[in-house]
Amino acid sequence: MPMTALADVFTKSVRTVALSTPIAVAGLMAAAVPVSAQSVLKVVPHADLRNIDPIWTTAYITRNHGYLVFDTLFALDENLEVQPQMAAGHEVSEDGLTYTITLRDELAFHDGSDVTAEDVVASIERWGARDGMGQKLMRVTESLEAKDEKTVVLTLSEPYGLVLQSLGKISSNVPFIMPKRLAETDPNTQIEEVIGSGPFRFVEDEWQPGNQVVYEKFEEYVPRDEPASYAAGGKVANVDRVEWRYIPDAATASQALLAGEVDYYEQPVVDLLPMIQSDPAINVETVDPLGTQGVIRFNFKYPPFDDKKARQAAMWAVQQADYMYSIIGDPQYFEEFCGAYFMCGGPYETDIGSEALREKDIEKAKALLEESGYDGREVLILDPTDIPVAHGQSLVTAQALRDIGMNVRLVAMDWATMTSRRAVRDAPEDGGWNIFPTWWLAADQLNPITNISVAASGDSAWFGWPENQKIEDLRNAFARETDAEKQKAIVEELQAELYDFVPYIPTGQYYQPTAFRDNVKGVLEAPVPFFWNISVE
Amino acid sequence: MYVYILRRLLATIPIMGLVAVFVFMLLHLSPGDPAVIIAGDFANEEQVDKIREALGLNDPLHVQFGRWLIDLLQGDMGESIYSGMPVTELIGQRVEPTLMLTLCTMVIAISLAIPLGVIAAWKVGTWIDRAVMTLAVFGFSVPVFVIGYLLILGGSRTLGWFPVQGYTSIFESIPGFLSHITLPALTLGAVYMALIARMTRATMLEVLNEDYVRTAYAKGLATRKVLVKHALKNAMVPISTTIGLGVALLIGGVVVTESVFAIPGLGRLTVDAVLRTDYPVIQGVILVFSFTYVLLNLLIDLTYVLFDPRIRY
């Protein structure tokens, strides 16, 4: 029997079973009616949506969910300039201390209530309690008040150059605007309801953690007139439903895209791209033009990396190409070399001081290590084997350090365990660590304030807890400076100090491709996957 | 017999109690702090501590255990640390796919493996026997995910008969259900089928050498009758034990199969929860799994009566 005939027999027998079963027929009819009338974008997201509160967690998946449901006061455009989004406009007083922000008309929440200045104030305050940049803004904020229904007044205690950059922050935590009743939730407790004023509505009934998340077009949303550009401009929902279907297995997700079961695969594995690209109906594009930065972080509390010379030795012992070939492989998706701590292609790109990273010099590294007084003690590198990007960085670092004579032990674990272990401040032999690998999206690394891996405020700094007053002074000077050219000069001075101090090794800049079928039109180029502007044919 | 069943059911209580204590201790003593994971990269120690406090993780272990146990006795398994959804609701969402996958797998596996095992024993030493045993070795040795990928490649991509992934509830659409469940059930069934076929063959071989089988043949009974009515019935006790024990194997395979075919079942829920140290969810699913396993063992013990009238409870 030919295969098609066999398939027919199968289909027919299946149909017979179905038609003889009233429940199935009723089910089929019920399912057919709404779906046929709707346009649906089926997406395989990079992770499962576990938390619905984008202020409570910094997880990128929750941030992406946030952008569908919530709106922001200001937003970053593709020129990396901050534009008004929910704000109609703003005025700054002559002394630069008072910002008066007016809200657009026709802003409404998904529960039907209007967006008011009070909602904005409560939302900014909650975000300011959690987010690093928000906390900095709150420190210089004298008052934040709702002057009337549509006007918010922010008064500063001292000049601050990053007010709009903070309120228009594009990555986690994004200052999303929620109704006051939700924004009054303790910042350390998750909100219990998802009500935003964004272009899509969260369909709570259809949310199945570990499986699917569904968003429906919010008909009352009024987009801005400007064309969409990064997070700014008109957020026009061109599909009725966006369905996130979490498929944990990369091979299965690729096959589902090839079979047309899904339309958009956010982060396909580079190894499987040749298979996906073999189908001409699938586009593979680097949607995020800014990319991602690999990071090798030291623990500054314990030898040997409490000594600057040991960190410099490590930097001379490695080169970015080794990392990139190990974790990405295809040179089409990474920069040959990027010496900028604040990303290549960003507004603060410079390669000042990056010689150690550009060239590998084992002899120099050995000499520096000796100068540091390294006594042969064991160096613990945390190795999250379930995340290829992190695992590859650990392996490359371990080999490079062994090459210069360090006694290295890789400690294999899963990512969740690593995120707990890196917070441990005890000595490496007592459950602590010396080195851990991670990565940051460029959107987080673009300037000295959002790039928390350069912060050097000691115990209150990011894991590893480096302390360097000069770096902190330069970061504060950058935040206070309102002149863009002067900010650039500060960054150059800062980067020279960073290469001397080595808070971490930037292991390279790489780009994550996204794959989507050719029935998907209007995918925006942006550091965050946005789902407005997209239509499905 | 009813007294026996009641006694066995009562015996599950201390067993479940032990499982509960063991699971709780194991989870809380293993590394991984959900508060740190939730707090993310930007949080300071004070914030992490506040989250820990909000989740009740700062209390001494026995207090946490007591709280969990009291809630559990009232039918409340707590809430997921991450999604905030009740564990009972999460498990409820996931029971059907896993139950259906396991049932379909058992139906396919048992209905294929027992006849294959019987035929292999009947035709022992011939090419039929060797072919069945080769298949069994293949099913047993090839990892579940490889079989899954091969079936996706063949059944979905090349022939286009079945969808690559996902699940449709049987209550929503029977054709949808059947098309979604076939490949996963075959995948998961491979190892199970191999196990049952080998066991059936081995026990049948033993039984076929018994005197009463020879007598049956001597009486002039048809081969089919001898094999099915006389030999197989007596071979069923060890076979049903294998079927029961094999369910443990299935539970392990379910996790992989559900991941490969993106089926939102209990296996995936367990893996996701373990990777994030979502304590209440892990505790909940392990309790459900062990309870099912204990019940299943009881069920298997009861089926012995059907096959061997000498057994009395």
Sequence positions of predicted segments:
Chain A
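Periplasmic-binding protein-like
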Residues: 305-346, 392-393, 498-506
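Structural transition elements
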Residues: 200, 333-371, 385-392
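Surface-exposed binding/hinge segments that line
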Residues: 102, 136-183, 188-208
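Extracytoplasmic/peripheral linker and loop segments enriched in polar/acidic and small residues
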Residues: 356-359, 409-423, 448-518, 537
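N-terminal lobe/hinge region of extracytoplasmic solute-binding protein
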Residues: 44-94, 125, 195, 506
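Aromatic- and charge-enriched surface segment that lines or borders ligand/interaction sites
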Residues: 88-133, 145-147, 153-155, 253-256, ...
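Long beta-strand-rich cores associated with HINT superfamily self-processing modules
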Residues: 207, 514-537
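Ligand-site clamp/hinge motif
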Residues: 223-275, 407
